[in-house]
Amino acid sequence: MEDKGHIIAIGGGGFGRNPNHRKIEKYILDLTGKEKPNIVFFPTASAEDKGYIVNYYKCFTKLNCDPSHVTLFQRTPRLDSIINKADVIYVGGGNTKSMLAVWREWKLDKLLLKAYNQGKVLCGVSAGAICWFEQGITDSWASNLNSMECLGFLPEMACPHYQEEKDRRPDVHEMLKKGKCGPGWAIDGGAAVHFNKG
């Protein structure tokens, strides 16, 4: 792997819905250039849903990698050590706002930026896709879609589930018209966008 960070933003779906559909996951692992890369999963946004974690292992134990996951709501291990050992950091979907609040409390945001600058592969689906951008379109609020500030590793805005949820497209267009979000990326479910640092 070249000494440049990678971010793979997945618009929806993935192993959370179908652990047997693994094309994007294989692509992510191949980016490391390693025979058996270490991949760590952060299911924070889903409140660490057990079924989601099971699907993660169903998917990645069938691929040539060493999968693990981290919980932040139980006894939390040393995050710096885990991030240092990881080749791939995979972030699951769920509530983006709550996830980022927890991450910042644990200073995980700073560790992830360091990992990106060291050339590791950062990736994720839905909340795990938009978290890397300056802005993300999220349904973290039950009432309606909102634009929120995210980590800012990548410029502009990102919206997942663009064709999967009927309100996404018109709501995003309305937000753009009203200046509630900037230009950016609308990512369909089952699709991914690859950003290469440098």
Model-predicted segments: where are they?
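Solvent-exposed alpha-helices and their adjacent loops that cap or buttress functional pockets
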Residues: M1-E2, T32-G33, S81-I83, K114-Y116, ...
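Short beta-strand-to-turn element immediately C-terminal to the catalytic PLP-Schiff-base lysine
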Residues: I10, C131-F133, F195-N196
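Short, glycine/charged-enriched secondary-structure capping and boundary segments
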Residues: R22-I24, V54-Y57, W103-K107, I137-S140, ...
